[in-house]
Swiss-Prot record:
The gene is uch2. Component of the 26S proteasome. Interacts with rpn10. Belongs to the peptidase C12 family. Residues 2-220 form the UCH catalytic domain. It comes from Schizosaccharomyces pombe (strain 972 / ATCC 24843). The keyword Protease applies. This is Ubiquitin carboxyl-terminal hydrolase 2. GO terms for cellular component: cytoplasm; nuclear periphery; nucleus; proteasome complex.
């Protein structure tokens, strides 16, 4: 079974890592690439960067750090469409001293730690549980094609990479590169400034009209962080937690809609619209009839 494309969305990525067993970590959108915006997040573990891949532009700015591969998790991307989950794991598995990875990822890290990057990538691709969690967030598509073809210059290919701080070094972890890319020394306190500088330099290589970038922060769960904050009153904590709870409910609903295939409903509704030439007064009854007919045809 192949890996499917999943949407670059904070709710998708947060549910994905929770389904893999990770505790008290969330992924959130970064709407502005500046130091103040980054510092609003509690305990940042890394940043996921999505961009339109271009072989002419995407050349490493830092230094290939081959010596680091014995001490950090770095996997080559050998499986199509796995780069989203691979970017997430590139951050999570390199912060296992700070993050509760859960059984699945802890066992995967232990199993793969002595493997070279190519075999780490193969091990990830062959992990049925990780692949199933990843694929569970694919949009429902009734017209699935098993055809596999190489991308052409006309195709728009998007790619995920990770930025993270490991042992006071700022790394770029890209499964399409030969090794981790070292961007120089960086303490935890310097992470925001370093991240802004490195990512802005990369974006500057693109055409000024190119705006198809997406940034997400992997950080400590905001609700868990709020519960331990002593600078907030109980009322302030309750209000902030309510906002986080509402956000999670919205994410859950959106993920449910992503998984659902509405084609059958639309087909049945279209049939009735054409057949009956309904007017506004019969819309609701026609809609309910279409729903019922669609439901009766669904497989158990």
């Amino acid at each position: 079974m192949s890996w499917t494309t999943i949407e670059s969305d904070a709710g998708v990525f947060t549910d994905l890592i929770e389904n893999l067993g990770v505790k008290d970590v969330e992924v959130d959108e970064l709407y502005s690439l500046d130091v103040d915006s980054l510092r609003q997040f509690p305990d940042i573990y890394g940043i996921i960067f999505l961009f339109k891949w271009n072989s002419k532009v995407d050349k490493p700015d830092g230094t290939m750090d081959y010596d680091s591969m014995d001490n950090i998790f770095f996997a080559k991307q050998v499986i199509n469409n796995a780069c989203a989950t691979q970017a997430l794991l590139s951050v999570l598995l390199n912060h296992s001293d700070e993050i509760d990875l859960g059984t699945t990822l802890s066992e995967f890290k232990d199993f793969s730690k002595t493997l070279p990057p190519e075999l780490k990538g193969e091990a990830l691709g062959n992990s049925e549980h990780i692949r199933c969690c990843h694929n569970s967030f694919a949009r429902s598509d009734p017209f699935i094609s098993e055809e596999v073809r190489a991308a052409t210059d006309e195709d728009e290919v998007y790619h995920f990479i990770a930025y993270t701080n490991i042992n006071n070094v700022f790394y770029e972890l890209d499964g399409l590169q030969a090794a981790p890319i070292n961007h120089g020394s960086c303490t935890k306190e310097e992470f925001a400034e370093k991240a802004v500088s490195v990512i802005q330099a990369r974006i500057a290589n693109y055409d000024p009209a190119e705006i198809r970038f997406n940034l997400m922060v992997i950080c400590k769960d905001k609700k868990a962080s709020l519960l331990t904050r002593e600078d907030l009153t109980d009322e302030e904590k309750a209000a902030s937690i309510a906002v986080e709870d509402e956000k999670r409910l919205r994410w859950k609903r959106e993920n449910q809609l992503r998984r659902h295939n509405f084609v059958g409903l639309f087909v049945e509704l279209s049939k009735l619209l054409v057949k009956d030439r309904i007017d506004k007064n019969t819309w609701n009854s026609t809609l309910e009839t279409a729903k019922a007919k669609y439901a009766s045809q669904k497989r158990p």
